[in-house]
């Protein structure tokens, strides 16, 4: 993957990697190989999103089977990739084009991506809060230099403004 990513990046193609780190209970060799691969990939892509499998243990029940937990890990990866592609491909009230996404993701290194849902009066803030505080990620948005917030659903301009204000408060912007 790092070789293909580097070739694409060298041609000016925006490259985004989304990877998982093995569970701690897996063989040490597997973790060492994964960490080595992540380091190589980090140098070969514009943006890298790393999701530690151990974080899945924080969102599943103790009775969750191993296959179900691994399916959850796959879902998280799928949501991350889908979220990025939807920014460009799915029409929205405020549309982003590929240039906007490139500006935020080109040569940025490790990134944070979160997905959240909310209901009720503060649904937009609840959704953004859930996204930025996702237990599945090791990163934080504190100090982030570039951010894309994609809020969908039946929300008002005030809801959207409140959600952005919440993010600005965290990032110090």
PLM regions and their residue ranges:
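Tubulin/FtsZ superfamily GTPase core signature
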Residues: 1-173
